[in-house]
Regions:
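Short, basic/aromatic beta-hairpin or loop at an interaction surface
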Residues: 76-89
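Bacterial N-terminal signal peptides that target proteins for export
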Residues: 2-17
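Short aromatic-glycine-enriched beta-strand elements
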Residues: 54-67
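Short nucleic-acid-contacting surface segments enriched for D/E, G, S/T with interspersed K/R
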Residues: 94-110
Length: 155
């Protein structure tokens, strides 16, 4: 009888351990940041075109601007587009970064670790945040001195 009871509790324990491992899998399934070159940083200013809140990471898409507030164009006359990946939507919303707070037309400055493959996309660099400067480029550009800093990333 003792053997059957021990065996039963052993099976229950193994099932509980398996369930605990399965519950931890979503966190372990998180993607790698190896696609970003964390040895390089680019500070970019642009006009927000789209804010995409996502369960895993929110993305902000913007048209690159020069220091005078003019949207930069590529050789085909189209706006030079960039994107930045931030933290989870729930986390950044708790820090004031929401679709409502960052509507299209908002001028922002971000520092990113760019993709290694050269495409115009990056992840928000550690020790930086998103600088929001309204809808008109401030004199001297969109900087921490002329705008409001949101979502400062830890070092």
């Amino acid at each position: 009888m003792n053997t059957k009871l021990s065996r039963k509790w052993g099976i229950i324990g193994a099932c509980a351990a398996s369930l605990a491992m399965l519950a931890a899998m979503p966190a372990a399934a998180h993607h790698s940041f190896a696609m970003y070159d964390t040895t390089k940083s680019k500070t970019l200013t642009g006009m927000l075109t789209r804010f995409l809140p996502g369960a895993n990471h929110a993305q902000i898409l913007f048209s690159l601007m020069d220091e005078k507030g003019k949207v930069m164009l590529d050789d085909k006359g189209k706006p030079v587009m960039w994107g930045v990946e931030t933290g989870p939507a729930a986390l950044i919303a708790s820090k004031g970064v929401t679709v409502k707070a960052f509507p299209p037309g908002t001028i922002i400055t971000v520092t990113v670790h760019p993709l290694r493959d050269g495409r115009n996309f990056g992840t928000l660099a550690r020790g930086t945040g998103i600088v929001k400067c309204g809808t008109i480029m401030p004199q001297g550009g969109c900087t921490e001195k002329t705008g409001e800093v949101f979502l400062e990333m830890p070092q």
